[in-house]
Regions:
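Bacterial Sec-dependent N-terminal signal peptides
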Residues: 1-21
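Outer-membrane beta-barrel biogenesis signature
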Residues: 17-44, 201-220, 233
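Short, charged, low-hydrophobicity "junction" segments
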Residues: 18-23, 165-170, 242-243
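Short, surface-exposed charged micro-motifs
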Residues: 23, 102, 257
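Outer membrane beta-barrel
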Residues: 29-179, 183-200, 219-222
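Detector for outer-membrane/organellar transmembrane beta-barrel domains
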Residues: 185, 195-198, 203-276
Length: 276
């Protein structure tokens, strides 16, 4: 008996392309695209920060150290349909969690409405991006008193008084439980912040990065106050901290900060108070 054996072959044609040359310079994102009709843009970037700690104990002359990845982030932003509808996202590669996922709508003049998860309008140091810090990390005040990130809605407005004086106001209603919390909440967090800039805007949004990299030619100052009321908070610090076992509590937080820059000199200071 004769048997016929069929052996199928799959032929795949692969095309080789030369390496593309991009016009995007270093520091302007891995992906930086814009549609021909200007209906959308997107910019995606990646960054990481490593850290080394060394500790010497004089009591027993012992030394210990460690090296690790402090942060690794993928972040992007752009607009869709119109420059008045912007979006921002940020993903923490190191810890595997979404940090920011927010839509920003400029619905009228100097009015903006934000919806999603992002940083709360709290102390200035927390709103500094980690890539724009002057020191290796944020302060202990920020660790224990920050409002951090939360999911909700924010209303923002800016008002010019005279030629230079600028007033920015920010209101937020959020779930009050912090980053990536999906549990049902019995209360919300209500936040208000006002920022006074008597000498006008900082160069290139310099009020929200630490050192005076742009070397302000004229003095620039921002004075700010924040109030937050967290109703029926389930965590010790509101948006941060350990869960409160079997109970909730109301938290009131006051924060004040000042930021000054002039010709390479920079200063910022913060005050925070929290009561139950």
């Amino acid at each position: 008996m004769k048997k016929l054996l069929f052996i199928p072959f799959l032929f795949v044609c692969l095309a080789a392309f030369a390496q593309d040359i991009t016009n995007t310079p270093f520091g302007k994102g891995i992906i930086n695209l814009k549609s021909k009709d200007n209906s959308w843009t997107t910019k995606v970037a990646f960054r990481f920060q490593t850290r080394y700690d060394g500790e010497f104990d004089f009591s027993d002359s012992s030394f210990s150290d460690r090296a690790y990845v402090r942060r690794a982030r993928i972040k992007g932003h752009g607009y869709a349909f119109s420059p008045k509808v912007q979006y921002k996202f940020e993903y923490d590669v190191h810890n595997g969690q979404v940090l920011d996922a927010v839509i920003k709508w400029n619905f009228a003049g100097n009015w903006n409405l934000w919806f999603g998860q992002t940083k709360m309008p709290g102390n200035i140091e927390r709103v500094f991006s980690s890539q724009k810090l002057q020191l290796v990390d944020r302060s202990l005040l920020n660790k224990y008193f920050t409002l951090d990130r939360d999911a909700g809605v924010q209303l923002r407005h800016k008002l010019n008084l005279g030629e230079t004086f600028l007033v920015r106001s920010k209101l937020a209603i959020s779930q009050g439980e912090g980053l990536n919390r999906k549990a049902w909440s019995s209360g919300n967090s209500y936040t208000g912040r006002i920022e006074l800039l008597p000498f006008g805007n900082f160069t290139k949004k310099g009020d929200y990065f630490a050192s005076d990299l742009k070397r302000e030619e004229t003095p620039k100052l921002m004075l700010s106050v924040t109030y937050d009321y967290n109703d029926n908070a389930t965590r010790q610090g509101g948006q941060m901290g350990n869960d409160i076992a079997g109970s909730t509590r109301d938290l009131q937080s006051w924060q004040a900060d000042a930021h000054f820059k002039y010709r390479g000199l920079s200063f910022f200071g913060e005050y925070a108070n929290r009561v139950t």
